[in-house]
């Protein structure tokens, strides 16, 4: 049986893999809707991985930002501005997920670049504090 810490580390490694392979690949191929979805996955898995390492259960929903700010923000050394930014990123990517998945909106290069930058920010902030 795996521990919460091991489960969390696995989620963080998966987030890193998706970032390096899928998200970067979608950007290179100019598949902007896929880039939005992969950025959302990176953020969701990063936040949930960190929560899991801390032994915090999370709901099985795509938006984890508010719980992360509330719980992990207390236990880890994040400044308020960083937490606010993580919550904003998590919210907008969770909201963009369905339209990008079902083709309800054609996301642009600028949207995808923003998503990429935001996912990179979140994964770097989590990585700096989780020591996986």
Enumerate the language-model features and the residues they cover.
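Terminal alpha-helical segments
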Residues: 1-132
């Amino acid at each position: 049986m795996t521990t919460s810490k091991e489960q969390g580390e696995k989620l963080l490694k998966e987030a890193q893999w998706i970032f390096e392979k899928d998200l970067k690949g979608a950007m290179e191929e100019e598949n902007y809707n896929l880039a939005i979805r992969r950025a959302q996955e990176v953020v969701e898995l990063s936040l949930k991985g960190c929560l899991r390492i801390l032994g915090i259960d999370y709901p099985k929903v795509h938006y984890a930002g508010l719980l992360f700010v509330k719980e992990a923000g207390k236990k880890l050394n994040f400044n308020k501005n960083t937490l606010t930014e993580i919550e904003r990123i998590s919210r907008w990517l969770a909201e963009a997920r369905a339209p990008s998945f079902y083709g309800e909106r054609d996301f642009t290069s600028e949207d995808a670049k923003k998503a990429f930058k935001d996912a990179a920010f979140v994964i770097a902030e989590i990585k700096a504090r989780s020591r996986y």
